[in-house]
UniProtKB/Swiss-Prot annotation:
The keyword Ligase does not apply. Endoribonuclease that initiates mRNA decay. CDD domains: HDc (cd00077), KH-I_RNaseY (cd22431). This is Ribonuclease Y. The gene is rny. Its EC number is 3.1.-.-. InterPro entries: HD/PDEase_dom, HD_domain, HDIG_dom, KH_dom_type_1_sf, Ribonuclease_Y, RNase_Y_N. It is found in: Cell membrane. Residues 333-426 form the HD domain. Residues 207-273 form the KH domain. The lineage of its organism: Bacteria, Pseudomonadati, Campylobacterota, Epsilonproteobacteria, Campylobacterales. GO terms for molecular function: RNA binding; RNA endonuclease activity. It comes from Campylobacter concisus (strain 13826).
Length: 517
């Protein structure tokens, strides 16, 4: 029990001691905390005082900056105001000066207006006075001259007109002479350029062709038994065949280039083949004629292509090819037309014209010469008619007419063709007048024979001293053939001038053909 009590007492004492100790420690901690709190409070108070002091300084600086900006802006505005005020003052002075000038001008204008009015009135008075004096002078002049005013005017105007005409004529004549001199220089230059730039071939047609043969024995075969082959050849081909002592040569003579060319080819084929007989001659003649017709078309197409032309009707192209077998005064018609085409193109180009159109007109200017005697009219009219029919360019038609003076040249291209034609035809040696007159005479003889009814063909041979006429046996009998020969001879005598005499031979042949089957 006692032990228990002692233990309790010890525990109470321990508890009390612990309480006292804890209280003491607690009091010590409180004092420390209190001191710390006081220190913090002082620090906060110091910071607050420092912040307040800084705030006062910032406010003072802000007030100072604001005042400074205000002062600067005020000073600037005052300066701008002063500048604008000065400017307005100057403008006001200018306006005042202008107003004064305007007022002065107005006063001067009013004064001038008044003076002008006075002057105008004085002018009217002077005009009236002048008019009166003029009328009085006219009356005096009329009385002195015995003329009315209108008559006097007419006399004066007539004299003025005569003088003016004389002056104008002198000036016109002067400029015309200058223009002609310049034109002549220009034309000479252009023609010189054209002739120097074009180098064409010279083509003079002959009246004979020569066929070379390997040996003279062939001459006998060509003549044939009793001359049958050579007679058939001359009748079918329409040419003179001259077989003489000239070695290795047979001469074909005809004024017709086309017939002569066909005859040359036929005899060459006969000589090459060796079969020379009448039937073979006729077959070859038909075949070669067809080949020549085809070659004529091809020749025309080649010419058109070489000249760079297009859209030419095939019939006109064929006529161009036929010009190869036509001649004028000994000059080949196709060579002449080509020469004219090239020269006309060069001349037109130099003058600022259409070179292609000039070439077209040049190649077609003598196209009428390609037509045979069956068509009536001059080659100019025939050529123009053909070109109109196939709707050729109007310049081409004008050139056809103009190159023989039937019309005036209406374009540069037509004039170029006329000049080129003159250059080609009129140059020395280009044509032979005597030959042309002979060819025309022979052609006229053939045409007289062909004009008779019932005549199939007619050929002038022996240099025009003989004409062989092939009659249609169904239309002309033997008795009528004699009469036809006499009629032809009489018409030749009356219409053709020729030396010596002309033999007229009318040949009538009847053939009966049948086939054994």
């Amino acid at each position: 029990m006692i032990e228990v009590l002692i233990g309790l007492g010890a525990g109470v004492v321990g508890v009390g001691a612990g309480y006292l100790y804890a209280k003491k420690i607690n009091d010590a901690n409180y004092n420390i905390f209190l001191e710390q709190a006081k220190a913090k409070a002082k620090a906060i108070e110091y910071e607050a005082e420092l912040t307040l002091k800084n705030s006062k300084i910032s406010v003072q600086e802000a007030e100072f900056e604001a005042k400074k900006r205000y002062d600067d802006k005020t000073t600037k505005l005052q300066k701008e105001y002063a500048s604008k005020f000065d400017e307005l003052t100057k403008k006001e002075k200018i306006l005042l000066n202008e107003q004064e000038l305007l007022n002065e001008s107005k006063e001067l204008f009013e004064k001038d207006k008044q003076d002008a009015k006075v002057t105008y009135e004085e002018g009217l008075n002077l005009k009236a006075t002048y008019q009166n004096k003029v009328e009085e002078a006219i009356r005096v002049l009329e009385h002195a001259a015995g003329l009315t005013e209108e008559e006097a005017k007419e006399v004066v105007l007539k004299k003025v007109e005569e003088k003016s005409r004389a002056d104008i004529a002198h000036i016109v004549r002067k400029y015309e002479e200058e223009a002609k001199r310049e034109a002549k220089k220009r034309v000479n230059y252009i023609l010189a350029q054209a002739t120097s730039r074009f180098a064409g071939e010279f083509a003079a047609e002959r009246l004979i062709n020569v066929v070379n043969i390997k040996n003279d024995e062939l001459k006998g075969r060509i003549i044939g038994k009793e001359g049958r082959n050579i007679k058939t050849l001359e009748m079918v081909l329409g040419v003179d065949i001259i077989i003489d002592d000239t070695p290795h040569a047979i001469i074909l003579s005809s004024f017709n280039l086309y017939r002569r060319a066909i005859a040359t080819r036929v005899i060459e084929l006969l000589v090459e083949d060796g079969r020379i007989q009448p039937a073979r001659i006729e077959d070859l003649h038909k075949k070669v004629t067809e080949e020549f017709e085809q070659s004529i078309q091809e020749e025309g197409e080649n010419i058109v292509m070489d000249l760079g032309l297009n859209k030419i009707h095939p019939e006109i192209v064929k006529l161009i090819g036929k010009l190869k077998f036509r001649a004028s005064y000994g000059q080949n018609a196709l060579a002449h037309s080509l020469e004219v085409a090239h020269l006309a193109g060069i001349i037109a180009a130099e003058c600022g014209g259409d070179e292609k159109l000039a070439k077209r007109a040049g190649i077609l200017h003598d196209i009428g010469k390609a037509l045979t005697h069956e068509y009536e009219g001059s080659h100019v009219d025939l050529g123009a008619e053909i070109c109109k029919r196939y709707k050729e360019h109007p310049v081409v038609i004008n050139a056809i007419y103009a190159h023989h003076g039937h019309e005036e040249a209406t374009s540069i291209e037509s004039a170029a063709v006329c000049a080129a034609d003159a250059l080609s035809a009129a140059r020395p040696g280009a044509r032979r007048e005597v030959l042309e007159s002979f060819l025309k005479r022979v052609e006229e003889i053939e045409n007289i024979a062909k004009s008779k009814e019932g005549i199939k063909q007619a050929y002038a041979i022996n240099a025009g001293r003989e004409i062989r006429v092939i009659a249609n046996a169904k239309l002309i009998n033997d008795d009528e053939a004699v009469l036809v020969a006499k009629e032809i001879a009489q018409e030749i005598e009356s219409k053709v001038q020729y030396p010596g005499e002309i033999k007229v031979s009318v040949i009538r042949e009847t053939r009966a053909v049948d086939f054994a089957k």
